[in-house]
Amino acid sequence: MPVPPPPAPPPPPTFALANTEKPSLNKTEQAGRNALLSDISKGKKLKKTVTNDRSAPILDKPKGAGGGYGGGSGGGGGGGSSGGGGNFGGGGPPGLGGLFQAGMPKLRSTANRDNDSGGSRPPILPPGGRATSAKPFSSPSGPGRFPAPSPGHRSGPPEPPRNRMPPPRPDVGSKPDSLPPPVPNTPRPIPSSLHNRGSPAGLGAPRPPFPGNRGAAFGAGSVRQNLSSSSSPFPRPPLPPTPSRALDDKPPPPPPPVGNRPSMHREAVPPPPSQNSKPPVPSTPRPGAGSQAPPPPPPSRPGPPPLPPTSSDEIPRLPQRNLSLTSPTPPLPSPGRSGPLPPPPTERPPPPVRDPPGRSGPLPPPPPINRNGSTARALPATPQLPSRSGMDSPRSGPRPPLPPDRPGAGAPPPPPPSTSVRNGFQDSSCEDEWESRFYFHPISDLPPPEPYVPTTKTYPSKVARSESRSGSNRRERGAPPLPPIPR
């Protein structure tokens, strides 16, 4: 509209008159102007209908039904009028105009509501988050719905949202009551302090329930954990070690590991022993294993020396995923474990199924090395494992012969798949899957790296920079033309 200023000010009929006069002056542009006018007039008609229909009810109903509800529904979430406009839908520009006109009363109502019931207001935003913001805006389109909620808000605005609150968070029914203590989590204070930004606050609020359901340990998940267990910040640190501890305590670890990190975080929060296991974490689960079953862990440490000498045995095992890069070179396992300590606990619980039988078999030292944590975890589960030892003992038997036959390396992978099937349910990490699927060459097969020779290296880019610093600009200018010449 602002693009053609002369025709814009008059209404559509004036448009037609002015255009009829102008085309007579310019005959060549008659068709183009007529088409533009027809399109503009059509657009204007549609816009008029939308603006009249939408603006009148929006302005009238909030005033008649009480600005308070308007603020609760739209003002809080629509403090940014742009967000409100999107929710109104229909005609964007008319919705925006309606928002601007009704925005002032909404903001005032929000201020009043904050003064009247500051604490009660926040629940309105979180319960629906996006849903609530969308519902109130969509409700005005349906006039029947709008008046009904308004009386409810008059009678008790905070109550209806609270009724909505519990369904999204059935696990934490007392959350609204317990909200004040967990304020540090800051899901609540944000809505209270940012009613105008109700939409973002709501977004933050609804997410906690859903991620909590997933058991994610991210801020939202921790909120529930903190509510469920008074130790709000503490559950997170012990969590990484907890998988090892909890698995030790629970002989049937397979089910929990399925969602090890998510589920374990929830389950691990209650058991404080996890904290006890945390200090040993730096040294991997060995110390924890020592506390629970000192005899096996010691073999695990002395075990490393025997394994390295039997490089042939280690080579076939690498593909089997038992050693997982630990046997070929003891230094490698240590860095790998030191970095991903938390993940290995999740990965290791399943392997104990294999390794403990190995203990029963003729190779007790190697299994402890294969997974230091597995020794500790396998101990509680050992009674169950002997039954599987029959299955695993043959594996331990073929392993020694396999080393001489590297071609047989193809054979070791088949047994791992069965174990990987077991672990597939438990392990969420990709390392185990890759180790079971693919065959990794031992270090002995790889060619030795070139010897390191200290030499001075020259970099032309640095040379040019040094010259430019010295002030020889002519050389720089000469250098660029040279490359184009060969081209």
Curated annotation (Swiss-Prot):
InterPro entries: PH-like_dom_sf (IPR011993), WAS/WASL-interacting_domain (IPR053099), WH2_dom (IPR003124)
Tissue specificity comment: Isoforms were differentially expressed. One isoform was ubiquitously expressed, another was muscle-specific and another was expressed in the liver, heart and testis.
Entry's Gene Ontology BP terms: actin cytoskeleton organization; actin filament-based movement; positive regulation of protein export from nucleus; response to other organism
Positions of modified residues (Phosphothreonine): T329
Protein localization: Cytoplasmic vesicle; Cytoplasm, Cytoskeleton; Cell projection, Ruffle
Pfam families found in the cross-reference section: WH2
Record-linked PANTHER family: OS06G0326200 PROTEIN (PTHR48226), WAS_WASL-INTERACTING PROTEIN FAMILY MEMBER 1 (PTHR48226:SF1)
The protein, known as: WAS/WASL-interacting protein family member 1
Organism this protein belongs to: Rattus norvegicus
Gene designation per UniProt: Wipf1
